[in-house]
């Protein structure tokens, strides 16, 4: 999973440099966590979005491990699987304002499309196979 996280961050650094005020990892850790979670969820179908108990940060759950843009989360007990209300809250709180739309798309939709162009099926297969 760390390989995918690093790939997403490096690709975002290249593709989003003119749209973000700083590097993408900082953005995904401080304000863009929902977008990051949606990107990973768009790549790994069996993953689920999680939110911490304080409703201040979200990440992704895959094979009983929780990840964010920094990698594996050190305090997974502080997170829960997001329900429909949590998702609406996260989209409202952590979602991207229109000024950060990229070519008419949310950052997550834009990045998922870019990732698909990169043909990383083997990486995804390896991640899904390793975690099982």
Predicted regions: what they are:
Residues 1-132:
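A structural boundary/capping signal
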